[in-house]
From Swiss-Prot:
It is a lipid-anchor. The keyword Cell membrane applies. Gene3D superfamilies: 1.20.5.110, Longin domain. This is Synaptobrevin homolog ykt6. The gene is ykt6. Residues 137-197 form the v-SNARE coiled-coil homology domain. Keywords: Cell membrane, Coiled coil, Lipoprotein, Membrane, Methylation, Palmitate, Prenylation. A lipid is attached at residue 194 (S-farnesyl cysteine). It comes from Schizosaccharomyces pombe (strain 972 / ATCC 24843) (Fission yeast).
Length: 197
C-alpha cells in the first residue's frame, strides 16, 4: 500500500488550477521520477476536471488509482495511490486535508486566479498515511482484532490438542488398570496352587 501524491486544486472558477501538492516518488528510479511526477500532475488535473462538484470517484490508470473528491465549495482533492490502498482511508484523508486547507486558507486567497499556496501539512499527511493501519483508527482496531483472533484460535487449538492428549492418557491408564487386575488375578491363581506348609 503506497501513496504517491496528495493534491489540492481549485475547481471553480474554471480552468482547474493546482493550488498545492505533495508527492513521494522515492519508490521509482531517479530517472523516472520527473516523468512520473508530470504524469501524476497532468492526470490529477484531468480527473479533477471530469469530476462533478459534490462527487467522489476513483479512476484506475495503469498501476495507479486516483481518488478524487470535488467539493461543492470549489475545492477538489486528489490522491494518487497504488491499487491496494484502502478507499475509506483515502477519502478520510481527502476530507481531512480539504477541511484543514480551507481553515488555513480562506476562499478569498485562492479563488481569484493562478496562485500556488504553501500548505506544509500535505507532506506530513503524505508520510503519516503511507501506513493506513497506523493512520486510521478503525483499520488499526481491525488489525488488533485480527491478531487477537489468531492468538485465540491458536490457544483453542492447543487446548483441544491437550484434551486429546488427556483422553489418550486416560485410555492408557484404563488399559494399564485392566492389565494390572488381570495380572493380579493370574498371580493369585498361581500362588493359590502352590501353598507351602
Amino acid at each position: 500500500m503506497k501513496l504517491y501524491s496528495v493534491s489540492i486544486l481549485r475547481f471553480d472558477p474554471k480552468p482547474v488550477q493546482l493550488l498545492c501538492t505533495a508527492s513521494d516518488l522515492s519508490s521509482f528510479s531517479f530517472f523516472q521520477r520527473s516523468s512520473i511526477g508530470e504524469f501524476m500532475n497532468f492526470f490529477t488535473k484531468t480527473v479533477a476536471e471530469r469530476t462533478n462538484p459534490g462527487q467522489r470517484q476513483d479512476v484506475e490508470q495503469s498501476n495507479y488509482v486516483f481518488h478524487v473528491y470535488n467539493r461543492s465549495d470549489g475545492l477538489c482533492g486528489v490522491i494518487a495511490s497504488d491499487k491496494e490502498y484502502p478507499l475509506r482511508v483515502a477519502y478520510t484523508l481527502l476530507n481531512k486535508i480539504l477541511d484543514e486547507f480551507l481553515t488555513k486558507n480562506p476562499r478569498t486567497k485562492w479563488e481569484s486566479g493562478a496562485v500556488t499556496l504553501s500548505f506544509p501539512e500535505l507532506d506530513t499527511y503524505l508520510s503519516k498515511y503511507q501506513d493506513p493501519k497506523q493512520a486510521d483508527t478503525i483499520m488499526r482496531v481491525q488489525q488488533e482484532l485480527d491478531e487477537t483472533k489468531d492468538v485465540l484460535h491458536k490457544t483453542i487449538e492447543s487446548v483441544l490438542a491437550r484434551g486429546e492428549k488427556l483422553d489418550d492418557l486416560i485410555q492408557r491408564s484404563d488399559n494399564l488398570s485392566t492389565q494390572s487386575r488381570m495380572f493380579y488375578k493370574s498371580a493369585k491363581k498361581q500362588n493359590s496352587c502352590c501353598i507351602i506348609a
